[in-house]
Amino acid sequence: VDGWRLDVAADLGQSNEYNHRFWKKFRQVVKKANPNAIILAEHYGDPSEWLQGDEWDTVMNYDAFMEPITWFLTGMEKHSDEFQAEWYGNGDKFFRTMEHNMSKFQRQSLDVAMNELSNHDHSRFLTRTNRTVGRIATKGAKAANENVEKCILREAVVMQMTWPGAPTVYYGDEAGMVGWTDPDNRRSYPWGKQDWELIEFHKDMIRIHKKYECFRSGSYKSIASGSHWICYGRFNKKLQA
């Protein structure tokens, strides 16, 4: 097995003490079988007490990726359950939130954190770009595709491929899939109806991510921000981007 994804891992057991004891033992067994196997936990909030090198390797990166990027680019909560105008386009708030949450990671954990825009638990990022509060039961399936803005999704993909962490594309996002939160976010792949332009854009950004090492393991620096814009850099000893 090359990797383990742990569902709500912090909730295992009846006490925090038991939880940590279990995951320490779990890591010993996993790494003995395969030293390179990754241990990836689903976790909301501060993960630092589990990321000390003897339990999890990293987490699904909600706090230092999915949530702040969604708030900044769309103003929406990741389930499409609310819109907050004070977040929308607020570059300074975005940087402050990101850097606070990134500080909870060890560097090696941040570099491999699972950076998603969408997944099986939350609304599709493209649907969030319509800035409509709702779910499948209240709005219906068709509304998930109304007034969406693919240009905002493309902005998000650029950030996904250049931000610290491991970019992880939820199936169909690259093809322009929409959907409200679970279960509507699990629609069938749109065979024959893919957005090929968007697919090619994803391929181009993935090539850039792979080509330049600074995007995979380089340092990060926020440079400037304003209303609906930000500027940041990635760099290592050989390259700045």
Language model region names:
Residues G13-Q14, K142-V148, Y189-W196:
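Short, contiguous acidic/charged loop-to-helix segments that flank catalytic cores in large enzymes
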Residues L12-R21, P47-S48:
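Acidic-and-aromatic substrate-binding clefts and catalytic sites of carbohydrate-active enzymes
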Residues Y189-S225, K238:
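Aromatic- and carboxylate-lined catalytic core of secreted/periplasmic carbohydrate-active enzymes
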Residues V1-S15:
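Active-site groove signature of glycoside hydrolases
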Residues D182-Y189:
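Acyl/amide activation-and-transfer machinery of modular secondary-metabolite enzymes
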Residues D2, N34-N36, A166, K210-S219:
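Surface-exposed helix-capping loop/turn segments at secondary-structure junctions
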Residues Y232-L239:
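Active-site beta-strand termini and strand-to-loop segments that position acidic
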Residues W23, R27-Q28, N36-D182, K210, ...:
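Conserved alpha/beta catalytic core and glycan-binding cleft of carbohydrate-active enzymes
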